[in-house]
Amino acid sequence: ITKNRKKGVGFKEYNRMLVEQNNQCAVCKTLQAGGNYNSFMVDRNPVTGDVRGLLCKNCNNALRSVGDNLHTLQSMIQYLQHYE
């Protein structure tokens, strides 16, 4: 609970978002592990600080690693498609 409250999202807001996302990561659709309040990360727009959704650790790390850069993400998709 503490981790998400530091991001300005309390228990009720977290649960509302989770219901809207069908208890899944907003990106990969992985189900929340065992109803654990801290199993998803609160994702925020790094520029505005607005809450965008709840992400699993892997998806959150992936976005952070590319710095939310759409060009980089598109290049990664093209790279993977090239080798399909």
Label each PLM-derived region with a short phrase:
Residues 1-41, 46-84:
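Contiguous alpha-helical segments
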